[in-house]
C-alpha cells in the first residue's frame, strides 16, 4: 500500500510539472504572438511610409526631405531586422517549451500507466484472496455436511 501512495505522489508531481510546462508554453506563445504583431505593424508602417515617399516624390520634394525619408526608412529597416531576430528567439522558446511539455506529458502518462497497472494487480490479488476464502468456506461447509 505504501508503494501505491508513492506512485500517486509521483503522479501528482508529474501532473503539476505538466501544468507548469503548459503555463510556460502559453506564456511563450503569447510572447511570440506579440512579436509577430509588432513585426507586422512595423512592416505595415514601413510600406505606408514608402508609399508616402513615392507620392511626395511624384509631386517633387527637397533634397533635405529626401534624406530624412531615407534615414527614417533605414531606421525602420533596422528595427524590422531586430524584430525578426526577436521573433526567431521567441519561436525557439516556443519550440523548447513545447518539447518540455511533451516530455513532461509523456512522463505523466507513464506514471498513470504504472498506477493503473498497480491498481489492476491489487484488484486481481484481492479477487484471488476472496476466491481462496470462498473456496475454503465451501470446503469447510462440505466437510460439515453429514452424508
Curated annotation (Swiss-Prot):
Family: Belongs to the FliJ family.
InterPro entries, alphabetized: Flag_assembly_chemotaxis_eff, Flag_FliJ_proteobac, Flagell_FliJ, FliJ
Subcellular location: Cell membrane
Functional summary from the UniProt entry: The FliJ protein is a flagellar protein that affects chemotactic events. Mutations in FliJ results in failure to respond to chemotactic stimuli.
Source species taxonomy: Bacteria, Pseudomonadati, Pseudomonadota, Gammaproteobacteria, Enterobacterales
Protein name, as recorded: Flagellar FliJ protein
Matches recorded under Pfam families: FliJ
GO cellular component: bacterial-type flagellum; bacterial-type flagellum secretion apparatus; plasma membrane; type III protein secretion system complex
Molecular function, one GO term: cytoskeletal motor activity
UniProt topology in membrane: Peripheral membrane protein
GO biological process, one term: bacterial-type flagellum organization
Keywords carried by this UniProt record: Bacterial flagellum biogenesis, Bacterial flagellum protein export, Cell membrane, Chemotaxis, Membrane, Protein transport, Transport
Amino acid at each position: 500500500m505504501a508503494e501505491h501512495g508513492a506512485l500517486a505522489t509521483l503522479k501528482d508531481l508529474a501532473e503539476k510539472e505538466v501544468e507548469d510546462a503548459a503555463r510556460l508554453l502559453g506564456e511563450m506563445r503569447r510572447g511570440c504572438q506579440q512579436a509577430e504583431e509588432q513585426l507586422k505593424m512595423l512592416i505595415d508602417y514601413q510600406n505606408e511610409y514608402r508609399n508616402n515617399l513615392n507620392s511626395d516624390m511624384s509631386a517633387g520634394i527637397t533634397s533635405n526631405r529626401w534624406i530624412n525619408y531615407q534615414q527614417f526608412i533605414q531606421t525602420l529597416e533596422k528595427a524590422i531586422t531586430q524584430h525578426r531576430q526577436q521573433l526567431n528567439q521567441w519561436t525557439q522558446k516556443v519550440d523548447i517549451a513545447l518539447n518540455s511539455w511533451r516530455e513532461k506529458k509523456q512522463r505523466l502518462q507513464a506514471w498513470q500507466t504504472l498506477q493503473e497497472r498497480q491498481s489492476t494487480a491489487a484488484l486481481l490479488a484481492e479477487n484471488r484472496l476472496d476466491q481462496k476464502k470462498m473456496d475454503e468456506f465451501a470446503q469447510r461447509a462440505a466437510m460439515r455436511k453429514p452424508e
